[in-house]
Amino acid sequence: MPPNPMHEIDTDADHPATQVEIEVVEAVAAVDAAQWDACAAPEAADGGRPYDPFTTHRFLKALEDSRSVGVGTGWQPAYLLARSGGLLIGVAPMYAKSHSQGEYIFDHSWSHAYERAGGRYYPKLQIAVPFTPATGRRFLTRQGHEAAAIQALTQGAVQVAANNGMSSVHVTFCTEEEAIAGAAMGLMHRKTQQFHWRNDDYACFDTFLSALSSRKRKTIRKERRVAQGFGGEILALTGADIQPEHWDAFWHFYQDTGARKWGTPYLTRAFFDRAQDSLRDDILLILARRDGRYVAGALNFIGRDVLFGRYWGAIEHHDCLHFEACYYQAIDFAIANGLSRVEAGAQGEHKLARGYMPVTTHSLHWIADKGFANAVAEYLDHEARAVGEEIEILTSYGPFKRTGTEDTPE
């Protein structure tokens, strides 16, 4: 994407003197880490854990330093900055995209239709965490400047796209509050769904199981027995317990899954070296070891209130080990650490039977071509209704006890 000069945006029609400067930078290292995190993770200023580990300066820098994003990847960093009176009041992890891979909010049909009509869909702008279908803030604002910064970043992204002749702007897995604010500014609000586990103040895993129907309790207990009887041990590692040898093993698992799902893994081997150096405290790594070697693993990231499940892989098949490593170990960790939610990534109706319930996820979209935008808006209206109906149906099939029904003794 061509360099975009700094420009000003008026963020308050009633007070025209309120000006915010918008700038695009092509490396997160161009922004002081403390200043970025003052917007991305103000709650962590005292050394605590950020709500969202994926928008921190250290995570985005690890993606860049490892060349998981950048030249040749189709994810070209174009971070959006908003300043008022010289103070950085907002940032957004924005990328110029030359494809639609690694986003998990699917617009392939849009791109095909756009190009069949004679348009050029790529490059487009994506405000997102690369390869990460985790929900969270996408317009990262300094406390006390939220409204002005969100408005400036939203308008700034659209202006950057328009100035550079780009087809569209996409803000994926944003918060519902951001989606509502963006829709009020003329962007299109898209609703999709994922499966999340919620912690209803459970004291332990058995307390969680007691909230389920008898049949589902029995199934989960059986799956855990089968998985834990695979002939080895399951390790839950975080912080200083994670060592380079663990990444050597996990890389093999990740490569296998990446090759089968995407053709090529999105993250490079160097990313896991960066994770060892600067991200270990943000990570929960579940590894299964048998006969002295690691045979499977699941990578999770830890937020202040949420555990985010990201990657699973294995070099041996063992019944139910996937469920144990990805879902049940995550629930154990969330309960033990007082986390309110586990996000288990994109798709997967099999998660429902294991206590992960359907929830609405949100994204925002702006398309330069008005005729095409109108067609997409009509499609999104139909899609939102279908998603709402699907969530209602799936919820009715959930594993939890029905109110007013008697449970069968075990």
Where are these regions (language model features)?
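N-acyltransferase acceptor-side catalytic subdomain
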Residues: 1-410
